[in-house]
Amino acid sequence: MKASLLNKLEILQDRFEELTALLGDAEVISDQTRFRAYSREYAEVEPVYAAYKEWRKVQDDLEGAQALLKDSDPDLREMALEEVREAKEQLLTLEAQLQRMLLPKDPNDGRNVFLEIRAGTGGDEAAIFSGDLFRMYSRYAEKRGWRLEILSENEGEHGGYKEIIARVEGENVYGKLKFESGAHRVQRVPETESQGRVHTSACTVAVLPEPDEQAAIEINPADLRVDTYRASGAGGQHVNKTDSAIRITHLPTGIVVECQEERSQHKNRARAMSWLSAKLNDMQTSAAQNAIASERKLLVGSGDRSERIRTYNYPQGRVTDHRINLTLYSLDDILSGGVDAVIEPLLAEYQADQLAALGD
């Protein structure tokens, strides 16, 4: 194992022991803010510490077996040789695991997200496909036990959505969905196509991490124009009775956010402000991310909204992710919420990029 990696693990072991002591300290236990913070850090550090402890045990076993290779008993030497082989294999596996565990964490991975889906080229068919994508992500969220709430929707004339915005809340939401941003293309025969010709349409997806209070950008109220209007669409008898829907325009950037799903104007405003903060944060970070991706020629992770990232081909039952040249013939499963079939290989490729960068 590299000396730099060993040094990091020794520091982490010291921190683990320190955290163990802190979590048993009566003064810390009585301060719930500190206790929760230390508990979260402990939960992150403990698996790495356990893997490092196992690595050290196997390293000791290897040294013991190597010493037996000099024994005069041939049977003992043969047994020791097998133990050396097994220990070396275990060490390689554990070292790879520890390297992955020590990769820099994206601080946004644990955040909730705003999911934006917009119809692009293709007219009605693009709007219908936006609806298909929204159902795909809704089913994926349901499988993972996440909570999804619609903030704003603009339905297409023949089904689907010209635009739909949702908030997704749960464990590691951004960590799973962050590589879904980009242009999604569909190739299929529309129901209105009498000649049976395959049409190509596209939608854009944006996944924005929801900032917490500390990370939220400070927004000058003078930079905002706030309009109220009557909600339209789903909502039962309450719709159109009160001006509960909110539209906020950030004048310096021209960004517009709307929220109409809550019955309370106050709740709609709070959701809209959180979404606006996420969009302003995204503007700041996107340029830096694109520069890094360009410099390192990353296949995954640029998050460029205009980049065509995936094609859904209905006649062939095929889904292709163009960033990693991944082709799967399981279109129905993926659209039914089995998005992990694409997400997991993307995350693996991203980790490989990070490991390569660590080796530079």
From Swiss-Prot:
Protein name as catalogued: Peptide chain release factor 1
Cysteine pairs bridged by disulfides in the record: none
Pfam families: PCRF, RF-1
Keywords, comma-separated and alphabetical: Cytoplasm, Methylation, Protein biosynthesis
Gene responsible for this protein: prfA
Summary of the function given for this chain in its UniProt record: Peptide chain release factor 1 directs the termination of translation in response to the peptide chain termination codons UAG and UAA.
GO MF assignments: translation release factor activity, codon specific
Lineage, top ranks: Bacteria, Pseudomonadati, Pseudomonadota, Gammaproteobacteria, Pseudomonadales
SUPFAM superfamilies per the UniProt record, alphabetical: Release factor
Xref: HAMAP family: Rel_fac_1
Keyword Cytoplasm set for record: yes
Modified residues (N5-methylglutamine): 237
Gene Ontology CC annotations of this record: cytoplasm
Maturation and modification: Methylated by PrmC. Methylation increases the termination efficiency of RF1.
Family: Belongs to the prokaryotic/mitochondrial release factor family.
Subcellular localization, as worded in the UniProt entry: Cytoplasm
